[in-house]
């Protein structure tokens, strides 16, 4: 639900966004066309992963870093909706540079 609403609002504001973008991986002769799935890719530059869990496992930060690496991007955001104040659920994630809460 959160993803669909956020996607709708981004498009309404004029942003280009891809939803549920499938990412391929290749290993030797093996080609997996839909190995990973990105919740939202905004303007081809910003990966958004949306979650609604408490506590937020560290594996989700690794997941978004993997997506950033596969897309050759440096910046992403992890949004967790299972918080009292939304500002407490927003994390900037950097490819190979750690994570930082906003």
Task: Kindly give the residue locations of the regions a language model identified.
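Solvent-exposed, charged helical/coil patches
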Residues: 1-16, 92-102
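Short, solvent-exposed polar/charged micro-motifs at secondary-structure junctions
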Residues: 27-31, 87-88
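Nucleic-acid nuclease catalytic cores
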Residues: 51-102
């Amino acid at each position: 639900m959160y993803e669909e609403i956020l996607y709708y609002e981004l498009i309404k504001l004029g942003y280009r966004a891809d939803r549920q973008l499938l990412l391929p991986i290749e290993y030797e002769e093996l080609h997996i066309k839909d190995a990973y799935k990105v919740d939202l890719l905004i303007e081809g530059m910003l990966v958004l992963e949306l979650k609604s869990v408490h506590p937020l496992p560290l594996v989700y930060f690794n997941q978004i870093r993997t997506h950033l690496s596969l897309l050759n991007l440096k910046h992403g955001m992890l949004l967790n909706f299972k918080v009292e104040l939304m500002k407490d659920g927003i994390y900037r994630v950097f490819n190979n540079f750690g994570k930082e809460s906003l």
